């Protein structure tokens, strides 16, 4: 009975501990600052690694409220919870400056922990102590405290090593198990997210359940097995840490070893390749973006973008050199600043422009002063740090804008073929993310790898496009001498609409999916720009439209590798690896049950398939086949051939198909009526020239001319029907970066191109009317810009302001209904004169009240229907009603 009693008691204690910790955890979300703003959103989640890589270089034990939520069920005593929760404000004060908002929030949280949570838990758990994490980096005694921690860690490492040596008599099974476990940890350490010497490579997560004992070493990385386990061998990465290694294995440190280790590093992100002054600028911008005002809005929100040139033309008359925070950030990312001082000058210019344009708004001026003070403090702090603190891997790397290999120039963002150590006939497809040079004169690049189908692990029934590649999460370093040549990878969504409008240097590959090597799964890429280097994300991708393009899909090139006894319940196999500097030698295939739903046409065994995909067993279609790209261009346009519109209807795609089939039928009918035209107008071969024969030939020639005239007339008429106009404009619009086409009603088409013929009168009239409303001074800066509005019956150019619809069904006709009727609707209306009541004939003492001017909005909405404005007569009438009665009357 005693064991059962002990077990029940332990369970009750665990349940009570969970309830107590959960209660204190939930109370954290009730904390507010003096102004009433909740502070929990600041500490709820860890900052993104992508945006704040330096955070994880400074903070060795990142903890958030979300971290506590996941760890509470695993705490065995209250001290573990206390160690973690105290770490949150300590981290915030370590990373942020003293005059920042987050530092103040951390003080509020720290005070609550000392005054409320700690006393509450102390009553129930008397052994609880408030952890002392030591001084902050800017406080005296910080270096001494860190040195003591390092010495303590070394003692623990030596003790673990001695304990491991004394346990050499353990059985072979246990030794093998521990060895496998250690190798797993070493592999994990060598993968992205664990090397503390690389800011970009450490990936923090709230999912880790760490050893509570690690809380005793707040400035040491969790998972310290890489240096203290007796079975650990040094990972392939060249760790240039100043802390000596305690491994018993000799570590080669020669140049050859450094080169091999660098190329074998599996990065999860491209490395930081910036000079110290650029990293200083990036740090300042990142901290500014997370600063929050007392009102809850971001400190930089008002400075992010410039005013709209059309809506606030006076701003560009007033400000000679407009610049926004977005412009500054773009110049920082593209390394256009050559010194930190240039960055400061632009920031001060932005503040000056803002104060000039908001000189009548004291609240905005106050915000600009706060921003200036914060910026000055951050800049001073960044400039005070030595340059060596910005060298992430212990070696200075000079960023390059260009490298030249075999007379071919390569830049960041270029697609390239890299030497494949496993198969020289299949170069690695990659995109260049970084270019740099080391002090020894060698030039390096970092590229994101794209796998070919035969290099992945996938289902045996999976289908692939011709020349398809999959994006991976591997960002590998290469010497520039590994460059073989150029290539180009196009996103599938863009390739559906047309061909890239550029000269291709090398083979063309198609990419639709991202491949996860750990889980062996394929995920469709929804946002292609997120996969590109930030230096080229804002560049336009010109496309030559191709309507009616469909894609052949082909079986897996390694389907023959499926074992004969394979079943749908087998484990997912592993690929066959070769050189660590290259993709797998060959992937693997496995079986799974048939997919009930296959929206993307990924598998040959599924029942459904998109119309733009042709699988191996599908019936062939008529069209122009391109064997090299694995595509076919049919006479039927696909739904993806048109650019995206603001108005979407389920009937539009079917209407396009109906229209195409109708046009084909008409063409066939016309073809059947055609008359043979050979030798018309001349006598038959070898026949005599008679009057009757001559008349017959003249009649045939007349019929031919009439037929040609009718055909020409039909052809001209077809150019003006609505579907043809839409198709033509679609082709023209897709050649430029003109944004989305917004279509609301058939009576107001919007064409994303400028009209250049027979519009002189319209342009002069339109400019004249706008000048009357806005004044010539406001019109001058933008009267000739692209997107000028022309109002007339029929298609028009880009609409920048929308007129309120009157609700007339003739003006609200849906676009699909307009296409179906294919007829112009006539507006039925009758002209009526404006009637006015006689104001002078009324009794002046009817009600003794002045007219209600505010109700005017209900009867005269603005902007007025179809651009109409009140007449001068009606305006005079309203003014007379508002005029006070004269004393003479």
From Swiss-Prot:
Q: Which residues carry this modification: Phosphotyrosine?
A: 612
Q: Where is the composition biased (Low complexity)?
A: 158-174
What is the first-listed, main subcellular location in coarse terms? nucleus
Q: Where is the Bromo domain?
A: 12-120, 280-382
Biased composition, Basic residues: where in the chain?
255-268
What InterPro entries does the record point to? Answer: BAH_dom, BAH_sf, Bromodomain, Bromodomain-like_sf, Bromodomain_CS, Rsc/polybromo, RSC1/2_bromodom, Rsc1/Rsc2_Bromo
- Impact after mutating residue 468 to K: In dpm3; defective in plasmid maintenance
- One of the GO BP terms on file: UV-damage excision repair
Q: Name one GO cellular component term.
A: RSC-type complex
Q: Where does the record place Polar residues bias?
A: 241-250
Annotated GO MF terms: chromatin binding
Q: Which residues carry this modification: Phosphoserine?
A: 682
What positions does the domain BAH occupy? Answer: 408-526
- What follows loss of this gene? Heterochromatin spreading downstream of the silent mating-type locus HMR.
Which keywords does this chain's UniProt record carry? Bromodomain, Chromatin regulator, Nucleus, Phosphoprotein, Repeat, Sporulation, Transcription, Transcription regulation
Which PROSITE patterns is this protein grouped with? BAH, BROMODOMAIN_1, BROMODOMAIN_2
Q: Other comments?
A: Present with 2330 molecules/cell in log phase SD medium.
Family designation: Belongs to the RSC1 family.
Assembly, in brief, is: Component of the two forms of the RSC complex composed of at least either RSC1 or RSC2, and ARP7, ARP9, LDB7, NPL6, RSC3, RSC30, RSC4, RSC58, RSC6, RSC8, RSC9, SFH1, STH1, HTL1 and probably RTT102. The complexes interact with histone and histone variant components of centromeric chromatin.
The name this protein carries in UniProt is Chromatin structure-remodeling complex subunit RSC2
Q: What is the lineage of its organism?
A: Eukaryota, Fungi, Dikarya, Ascomycota, Saccharomycotina
Gene field: RSC2
């Amino acid at each position: 009975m005693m064991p059962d009693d002990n077990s029940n008691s332990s369970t009750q204690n665990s349940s009570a501990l969970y309830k107590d910790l959960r209660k204190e955890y939930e109370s954290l979300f009730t904390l507010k600052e003096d102004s009433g703003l909740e502070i929990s959103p600041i500490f709820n989640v860890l900052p993104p690694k992508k945006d704040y890589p330096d955070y994880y270089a400074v903070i060795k034990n990142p903890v958030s409220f979300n971290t506590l939520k996941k760890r509470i069920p695993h705490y065995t005593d209250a001290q573990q919870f206390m160690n973690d929760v105290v770490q949150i404000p300590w981290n915030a004060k370590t990373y942020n400056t003293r005059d920042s908002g987050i530092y103040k929030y951390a003080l509020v949280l720290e005070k609550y922990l000392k005054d409320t949570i700690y006393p509450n838990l102390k009553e129930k758990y008397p052994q609880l102590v408030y952890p002392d994490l030591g001084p902050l980096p800017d406080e005296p005694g910080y270096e001494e405290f860190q040195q003591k921690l390092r010495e303590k860690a070394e003692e623990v490492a030596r003790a673990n090593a001695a304990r491991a040596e004394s346990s050499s008599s353990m059985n072979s099974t246990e030794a093998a198990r521990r060895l496998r476990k250690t190798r797993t940890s070493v592999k994990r350490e060598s993968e992205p997210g664990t090397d503390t010497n690389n800011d970009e490579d450490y990936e923090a997560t709230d999912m880790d359940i760490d050893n509570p004992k690690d809380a005793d070493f707040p400035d040491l990385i969790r998972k310290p097995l890489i240096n203290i386990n007796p079975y650990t061998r040094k990972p392939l990465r060249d760790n240039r840490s100043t802390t000596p290694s305690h491994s018993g294995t000799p570590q080669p440190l020669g140049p050859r070893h450094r080169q091999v280790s660098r190329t074998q590093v599996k990065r999860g992100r491209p490395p930081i390749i910036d000079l110290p002054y650029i990293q200083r600028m990036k740090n300042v911008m990142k901290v500014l973006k997370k600063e929050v005002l007392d009102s809850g809005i971001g400190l930089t929100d008002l400075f992010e973008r410039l005013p709209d040139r059309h809506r606030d033309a006076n701003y560009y008359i007033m400000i000679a050199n407009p610049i926004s925070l977005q412009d500054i950030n773009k110049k920082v990312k593209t390394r256009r600043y050559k010194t930190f001082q240039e960055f400061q000058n632009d920031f001060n210019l932005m503040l000056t422009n803002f104060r000039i344009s908001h000189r009548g708004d004291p609240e905005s001026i106050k915000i600009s002063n706060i921003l200036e003070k914060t910026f000055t403090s951050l800049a001073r702090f960044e400039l005070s740090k030595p340059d060596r603190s910005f060298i992430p891997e212990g070696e200075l790397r000079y960023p390059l804008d260009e490298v030249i290999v075999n007379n071919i120039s390569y830049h960041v963002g270029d697609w390239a073929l890299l030497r494949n150590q496993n198969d020289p006939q299949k170069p690695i497809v990659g995109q260049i993310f970084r270019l740099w040079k080391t002090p020894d004169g060698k030039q390096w690049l970092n590229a994101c790898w794209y796998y070919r189908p035969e290099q992945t692990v996938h289902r045996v029934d999976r289908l692939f496009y011709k020349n398809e590649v999959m994006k991976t999460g591997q960002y590998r370093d290469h010497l520039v001498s590994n460059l073989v040549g150029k290539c180009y990878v196009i996103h599938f969504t863009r390739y559906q609409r047309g061909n890239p409008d550029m000269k291709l240097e090398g083979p063309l590959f198609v990419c639709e999916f991202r491949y996860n090597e750990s889980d062996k799964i394929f995920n469709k890429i929804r946002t292609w720009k997120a996969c590109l280097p930030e230096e080229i994300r804002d560049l336009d991708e010109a496309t030559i439209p191709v309507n009616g393009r469909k894609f052949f899909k082909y079986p897996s090139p390694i389907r023959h590798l499926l074992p004969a006894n394979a079943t749908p319940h087998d484990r997912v196999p592993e690929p066959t690896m070769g050189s660590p500097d290259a993709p797998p030698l060959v992937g693997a295939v496995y079986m799974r049950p048939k997919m009930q739903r296959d929206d993307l046409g990924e598998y040959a065994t599924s029942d459904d398939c998109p119309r733009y995909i042709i699988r191996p067993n599908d019936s062939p279609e008529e069209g122009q086949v391109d064997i090299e790209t694995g595509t076919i261009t049919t006479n039927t346009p696909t739904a993806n051939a048109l650019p995206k519109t603001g108005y979407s209807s389920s009937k539009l795609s079917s209407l396009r198909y109906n229209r195409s089939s109708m046009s084909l039928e008409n063409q066939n009918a016309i073809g059947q009526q055609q008359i043979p035209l050979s030798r018309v107008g001349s006598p038959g071969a070898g026949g005599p020239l008679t009057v009757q024969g001559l008349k017959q030939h003249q009649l045939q020639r007349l019929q031919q001319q009439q037929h040609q005239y009718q055909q020409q007339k039909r052809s001209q008429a077809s150019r003006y029907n609505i579907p043809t106009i839409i198709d033509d404009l679609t082709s023209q619009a897709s050649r430029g970066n003109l944004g989305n086409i917004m279509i609301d009603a058939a009576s107001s088409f919007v064409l994303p191109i400028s009209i250049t013929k027979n519009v002189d009168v319209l342009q002069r009239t339109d400019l004249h009317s706008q000048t009357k409303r806005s004044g010539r001074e406001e019109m001058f800066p933008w009267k000739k810009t692209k997107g000028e509005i022309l109002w007339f019956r029929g298609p028009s150019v880009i609409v920048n302001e929308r007129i309120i619809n009157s609700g007339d069904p003739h003006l609200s006709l849906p676009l699909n209904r307009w296409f179906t009727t294919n007829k112009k609707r006539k507006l039925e209306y009758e002209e009526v004169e404006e009637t006015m009541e006689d104001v002078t004939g009324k009794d002046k003492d009817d009600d003794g009240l002045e007219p209600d001017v505010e109700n005017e909005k209900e009867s005269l909405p603005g902007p007025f229907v179809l651009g109409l404005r009140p007449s001068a007569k009606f305006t005079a009438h309203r003014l007379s009603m508002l005029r006070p009665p004269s004393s003479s009357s």
